[in-house]
Amino acid sequence: MVYQGKYRPLIIFGTSSGAGKSLVVTALLRIFSDMGIDTVPFKVQNMSLNAGVGIGGEMAYAQIIQARAARVYPSVLMNPILLKPEENKTHVILVGKYYGTFSSGDYMRSKKEEIYKIALECFNRLQSEHELVIIEGAGSPAEINLDNDIANLRIAKDVKAKGILVADIERGGMFASVVGTLELIDFRDMIGIIVNKFRGDESLLYKGYEFLERKFGITVLGTIPYIEHNLPEEDSLANWTKKEGRIKISIVKLPHIANFTDFEIFESIEDVGLVYAKKPEELKNSDVIIVPGSKLTVADLEYLRKEGFEDEIKKQYRDGAFIIGICGGYQMLGKYIIDNVESKKGKVLGMNLLEDSKTEFFPYKKTNRIFGHILHPYFYGYKIEGYEIHMGITISRNYFSKIYREGNRYIKRFDGSYYKNVIGTYFHGLFDNTKFTESFINYIRERKGLDKVKLKIESLDERINKIANIFKKKVDIKKIIDEIKIS
């Protein structure tokens, strides 16, 4: 292979899901960017319900964060295959556009090779335009039951990448998982190992590190302490826990929830309590209820109705709670949904909390980076930016915001709806706009007789820099550079 850049590609493997691959990629991208190296992220295939919009359409939110770390604009070339699970099937996004919905077996048997070739072309484009591509693997490269895994060894060997193995010591059994992984995989270009999430005396690990070097000839590049980084996690849905605070914000835990990054910012805001409601009674005494996005809007609306969530949401609204619907949640709050695409159930009544909002689904999806300002009288004029990913068009009258830009194109259109204490919007990332979020939290605080506060929210760049600085101190960056640099 002829390398277009100055460096061989670098792939980050993990001993398991959740080992810290995304974190390591993010840190290295920022470190190399700081060094003046033109670096970009790449992940062949990502299975995630957290999606965003980059150049070319829809892509995994993790690679959008990584592009930010590299200080480049996110592109669908960085995540050519996005798998979004729904029921017993998988919704496939290929190079930013909807490709089809398949059972896992059908996708593995009939589509994977065809799609992989397209993904490899995306990698080659990135490699030709940048100095260094850092690839994030998926899960573990040692899944011996999978003979057609395209996200780990296949891509690594096809592009002749050098590798780093990330191991999570917090779970226990770290040395066994490293030894097992290295024994099971046939990969001769491993630079070294990064041990992640360590708490305690590092010297206690040195004997094990010496064993790994004797057995495999591979050194440990660094030991990373446990970091409270507050970056969005691909699998963070599994880690939801209740958070206490005088302001109670309740998130309705939909069966087919999508884009739960929309409210992760509340995890880091002091005195804000978070409840991820699995039962209607958990919504009681809420100050704010958020109905999030959904992969299957009508199915989730019917679930809310059947399980008693709709009645409780309406009761909380009457008691003064602020109700917010984002994307599919917005559609559910309206008067009705006409769905001949997803559920094919035709006209379905909504919750009617936004009675001027009526939605009809169409077989195409809108994916845009959007910029606007708020029209709601409580928060009028605040500038917001985010992205929209949705099927369907919603007609309303009392618009929540005015959009003035889509991507690089200046336009004039409107988004969402509001009525008193109910807001519906297609703006994913709404609460990442910290000036608006501070105003919103203080509005809720004032209603409860609490003093206004200045929110202490670190920007995404500040959080990335904090992680990168730890890695600079703890990881042998020079060895990595020496191994991948093309002489």
What kind of feature is each model-predicted range?
Residues 1-315, 322, 375-487:
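Flexible phosphate-sensing "switch/lid" loops adjacent to ATP/NTP-binding sites
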Residues 304, 311, 317, 333-338, ...:
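Extended, hydrophobic alpha-helical segments
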Residues 327:
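Catalytic nucleophile serine of serine hydrolases
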